[in-house]
Amino acid sequence: MITTENLLTALPVKFKAAATQSLADKLNTVSKDPIVAESVRNNFITYASVLQTGRYKLEEYLNAVKYVSFKHMGLTNQKSYQNTFPKRYLKLVSEGRTDKEISAYVAAYSKTKLVTAIMEQSLIPMWLLHTDAYNKAVETQVELMM
């Protein structure tokens, strides 16, 4: 479960005001599936530094994190988009859009700067992303061995 303290620690300075109980609740109830919810919460915290690289809204960031989380679970672009934006997807279907048209929307979303930035950061190994914590852990292990 994410707390406001976790959010305050993880979010860049310009987003500290958004670290509210409301946001924590939203992240804690992001999915009915506990595995998906945990993945999205972890990714939201892990990739928060992406928010410093552009002019993004927190809602856009959360949606991009959800999309990338579904992609990392092995889902296709289309299924990831459908799970991230269920209402938007149903609207496209109810408007009679063809699979080809929907695929164009999905492809456009998957190539946005925000999604691309999160995907790029997700390719960086965790130990490299958190080098300082990794080094402290190694130093602690060395001390314990002595």
Model-derived segments and spans:
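N-terminal, charge-rich alpha-helical recognition modules
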Residues: 1-136
